[in-house]
Amino acid sequence: MNSGGEEPTIKPNVFNITQLLNSNGEKPGIACIFLSKFDMKKGNIIIWSKSINGAAIDLSNIEFKSLPAGIHEQTDDVVNFVVPKELDVCQTAKTTTYDYGIAYFKQNSFDIIENDNRIDRSKVQMFSLGVIIDVQNASSDSKKHFYKEIYHAYAANRYSSYLESLLGQWIRQRDLDKFDIFEKFFDENNQGHMAENSVEVFEHSPKERRHLVEYLPYWTRKLGPLIFPLWKASLLQSRILILVPQGESFELCNSLAYCVFLISMLPKNLIGNHVSDEYIKPIFTVSTSDIPFLESFKKGNGYVATTSEEILLYKPEIYDIVVKLTSSSTIEESPEKEVEILTASGEQNKATPLDLEVYEKLILGELQEDASTNATCRHHEVTEPISWLQFLIDGFFLLTTAGYLVAPYHLANNFKIPRHVSGPEPNNSEIQIAENLVRYFHRRTSNLYNDLKDVIQKSENIDSEQPITIAASFLTKLNLDCFSKQDHQFVKDIALKWFQRSIDISNLPECLGNLC
């Protein structure tokens, strides 16, 4: 980890969701606008586009990004994506830059079926209207208030409601060979125009769509204790693929990618200015056409992306873990089916027993929910069984204290969720829950970083080539599971990533006295 002594240019004390939501009024200039279409004979095609003069934006395969496989099962949807800039031969994702894009999709096939009781292919219309933002040249006062990376990853979304309105107007005009409405919108809001007029706030703006961060409570409920191994993987900058199930909204699934990116961020006051290399990269919707781009991401410089193309899972060299979601009907109506997290080798990645305990005793309280019997069973299905050693120690405490005391390692869940009312919308509990959850994970990350840093600094006299040995009981201080091999490996990996130091963890029997 880069730990230069320079003072950070941006120093937010805590995550503030009001600043994030209010920034919706600030819209960066558009570098490119395009219209793609699904043609019954030709497939996905671009039928119109316009870019600012001198913009080196590669629109190759943009028709597949804006019309990903499976989107035809939605009446309308929003698709996030990135457009990589040209890769040099020796360039890696650590230096790769890309532009963020968004497209609004709309089709009429379901209306045709409802009206005619059959599908007339000659009448089917499937369009995606999209914009691309060159975030390298974007300017916003938001950068002064909170992480510019959060702003960049969401920059294109600030146009989603406008694209919805524009595409609807264009379809209603019935002359589908006229693009004047798009031309006018681009001329008023392109990067060159807005650079001269600062950040423009639109008059008579259409109603904003939900901010992607507002889906965090939803995903925390659906993932259950699996939110924790996903958070740990994001801190390690694993390459994470989220598999979009059949019939699911791309907007919903991309919100998970954004939320994973958001909760993984390291506070800038810990790591200084050199932060761009330390975040997992949200690249949103990808397909087989993006394989060369995905191959540029090496282990430890990861991404979080969504895909509806299961064929990508047959290329384990391009990802570390895959999150297999259930379809919306399954999520809502058949909760017995659980989300799965699998490694590239096909092994299931489960939550630790402590993750489960923290989720049920802490996170569910924040979500204002009680664990039902069915939910408890489902949570246990995605959790590792407790070790025999923990079983014996728990039994010892139960017998000798009549259940009055528990072993110290259970007290890790006393790590409280920071509560903070930051905005003028106290009635919107979901927004407040989202903020509290983000701040909880940021605080856990900060504590993990600081505690490991203290241990390493106290061992400075040890040869840097020699591993630093810590007791397994120390993981309790880190709010991790001292019995779990998974958490043992996580501590070793994160210490090596952040501090370039190797750590050994003592065998559990050696620390039994500390635990008892």
UniProtKB/Swiss-Prot annotation:
Covalent lipid attachment of type S-palmitoyl cysteine occurs at 511, 516
Q: Which domain of life is it from?
A: Eukaryota
Q: Where is the dDENN domain?
A: 367-513
Other noteworthy facts: Present with 2550 molecules/cell in log phase SD medium.
Protein localization: Lipid droplet
Entry function: May be involved in lipid metabolism.
Ranges for domain cDENN: 211-365
Is Lipoprotein among this UniProt entry's keywords?
yes
Q: GO terms for CC?
A: cytoplasm; endoplasmic reticulum; lipid droplet
Which UniProt key words apply to this protein?
Answer: Lipid droplet, Lipoprotein, Palmitate
Q: Describe the location of the uDENN domain by residue ranges.
A: 31-185
Pfam families, per the entry: DENND11, DUF4484
Q: What is this protein called?
A: Uncharacterized protein ANR2
